[in-house]
Amino acid sequence: MLDLNLKIFSSYNEDQDRKVPLMISTTGEEESNSSSSSTTDSAARDAFIAFGILKRDDDLVPPPPPPPHKETGDLFPVVADARRNIEFSVEDSHWLNLSSLQRNTQKMVKKSRRGPRSRSSQYRGVTFYRRTGRWESHIWDCGKQVYLGGFDTAYAAARAYDRAAIKFRGLDADINFVVDDYRHDIDKMKNLNKVEFVQTLRRESASFGRGSSKYKGLALQKCTQFKTHDQIHLFQNRGWDAAAIKYNELGKGEGAMKFGAHIKGNGHNDLELSLGISSSSESIKLTTGDYYKGINRSTMGLYGKQSSIFLPMATMKPLKTVAASSGFPFISMTSSSSSMSNCFDP
């Protein structure tokens, strides 16, 4: 194998070699066995190129050194080092912040599992049921779901959930509104245990849903009137009748009606069930329905007066007689109260 690498031999310096013409000499097969492959002319002092077949290291000339590399540096290397240190410190602090953020997110996830937000409501612990058409509130306690009541609005159900969450889990519980809104309720919660508090919420939701009144036996109907369960008005307590008259249309904008059984100095204290209205004028006549209702609906101008009106006992008839004359069947009723037993004739 022949090594055809070109080798440059020169007796001058490197600067002079660039100015001297070159002569190429080749060696044939006859001179391959000789010890030298090329000769130089000392008089001409010319350089020549030869094939390095014999690879003589003595005649080899090292290549010229490469040109010096130009390096550029900052005018203020100290500032650059400071910037590097700042970058490293920022990266370290950012890494620490990431770890702290991850821990905080994990804590928040664990805390939100107590009361997950409902899909059907924007409030926590509130769910809308299409079957009933109401918003129901629930809370988890000791692995069980506690029913807090059904409400007509999501806001009322959310308020009930917040109060239950504060009662069960304290002031740090996840609620829908601000804790300061329940300062008045917190004072009442201290005197009640969990069972009593849940029963209180359920009672409020039941009365709110049915439109009940603060009076016993009254409920708000669709016609926006408070009516009783018994239209004959056979009640043991006259407060029920007072509430019915107060909240009906005939009682709107009128003065408070007084009943003869509760006024001192009235001689008709034995008035039990049938409540009527009478005036000084004899032209007003009571109908059969007035004995049942206790009100003469035909005289609308009567309510413009602010004076107290009573039904005299002389004009009243027993309920049994009125029922017989009007054609309505009379059903006798028994009660443990003495006031109820005295109302009917034997």
From Swiss-Prot:
PROSITE patterns attached to this UniProt entry: AP2_ERF
GO molecular function annotation: DNA-binding transcription factor activity; transcription cis-regulatory region binding
Ranges of the DNA-binding region feature: 122-178
Subcellular location: Nucleus
Entry keywords, A to Z: Activator, DNA-binding, Ethylene signaling pathway, Nucleus, Transcription, Transcription regulation
Alphabetical list of Pfam families matching this protein: AP2
InterPro entries for the chain: AP2/ERF_dom, AP2/ERF_dom_sf, DNA-bd_dom_sf
Induction: Repressed by miR172 after photoperiod changement.
Gene Ontology terms: biological process: chloroplast organization; ethylene-activated signaling pathway
Predominant cellular place of this UniProt entry's protein: nucleus
GO CC, one annotated term: nucleus
Any further remark recorded for this protein: 'Schlafmuetze' means 'nightcap' in German.
Family, as annotated: Belongs to the AP2/ERF transcription factor family. AP2 subfamily.
PANTHER family, alphabetized: AP2-LIKE ETHYLENE-RESPONSIVE TRANSCRIPTION FACTOR, AP2-LIKE ETHYLENE-RESPONSIVE TRANSCRIPTION FACTOR SMZ-RELATED
Reported function: Probably acts as a transcriptional activator. Binds to the GCC-box pathogenesis-related promoter element. May be involved in the regulation of gene expression by stress factors and by components of stress signal transduction pathways. Repressor of flowering.
Full protein name: AP2-like ethylene-responsive transcription factor SMZ
Lineage of origin: Eukaryota, Viridiplantae, Streptophyta, Embryophyta, Tracheophyta
Gene that encodes it: SMZ
